C-alpha cells in the first residue's frame, strides 16, 4: 500500500504543483489503484508515473470545486482510448453524476468500459472482504467529504510445518484449519484451527481530509490512522484567511493529527503563495512543532503505508 501524490497545490496549477489528486496504490493487495480527487491535468501527471489508467478501479471525489474534478473527463476518455475494459466506480457528492454525464455527452466521448457513479452520503460507501471506506461531511462551504480507508485485519498464516510434524497431511482439512475451525481427524484427534495460525496482521488506515476547516469531524475520521493526508492551504499566521475560505492551516492540521492519534501526517493542497524552499520549510516546521511526524507533500512524492 503506497500513496503517490499526483497534485499537491491549491486552487489552480502552479509551476511546481499541480492541482489535487492522490493515488492510493493497492497493487499488492488487489492489483489496482484508487484515486482521491482528480484535478485538471491529473492524467498528464500519471504519464510521469508507472500507473496504468486501466488499473484505476475507483475514484473518490471529496467535493465539486474545479481543482478537484476538472481532470475527470479527460482521464475517463483516455482510459477508454487506451483499451481499458475493467469497470470503474466513482464516488462523490450530489452533482458528480450530472457533471460526468454532461461532460461525456457534450464531447461525444464513448467509454469502452462499465462506469458506475455513486452520489454518496455520510457513512460506509464501499466494503468488501479487504477494505471498508467511510465518508464524513467536512466544513468547506459546499457539500464536501473526507474519506477513511480501512484495511481489514489479515488472518494469520497457517503453520503448515507444525501440522506436518503432527502427521496431518495436506488436504481439504488444511482449509478448515486455516479458517480457525475445530476439526475432528480420521484418527479421532480434535484440532482447534486457531492453535495453528500465526497472529493476524493488523489492517492499515489512511484518512483523507479533503478541503476543510479544522474540524472534530476530521479528527474522528482520522482516529488511529497510519497516515492522515490533510489539507494545509495556509500558514499558521494566515489562520483568519483559512477560516474565511473554509480551509485549514499547517498548525491546525497538526493539531488534528495529534488529537486523532494518527501515526503520520502528510500536508497537501498548499497555496501558491508559499513558493520556494524556505517558505515550505517554514510550513513544515509549523506542523512539526505540534506533531513531529509531519511532512509537506510535493508532486510525485511516494509514501509507503507501513503496518503497525
Curated annotation (Swiss-Prot):
Keywords: Endonuclease, Hydrolase, Metal-binding, Nuclease, tRNA processing, Zinc. Homodimer. Belongs to the RNase Z family. This is Ribonuclease Z. Gene3D superfamilies: Ribonuclease Z/Hydroxyacylglutathione hydrolase-like. The keyword Hydrolase applies. The gene is rnz. GO terms for molecular function: 3'-tRNA processing endoribonuclease activity; zinc ion binding. It catalyses: Endonucleolytic cleavage of RNA, removing extra 3' nucleotides from tRNA precursor, generating 3' termini of tRNAs. A 3'-hydroxy group is left at the tRNA terminus and a 5'-phosphoryl group is left at the trailer molecule. The keyword Nuclease applies. Its cofactor is Zn(2+). HAMAP family: RNase_Z_BN. Zn(2+) 2 binds at residues 67-68, 211, 269. Zinc phosphodiesterase, which displays some tRNA 3'-processing endonuclease activity. Probably involved in tRNA maturation, by removing a 3'-trailer from precursor tRNA. Binds 2 Zn(2+) ions. The active site is at residue 67.
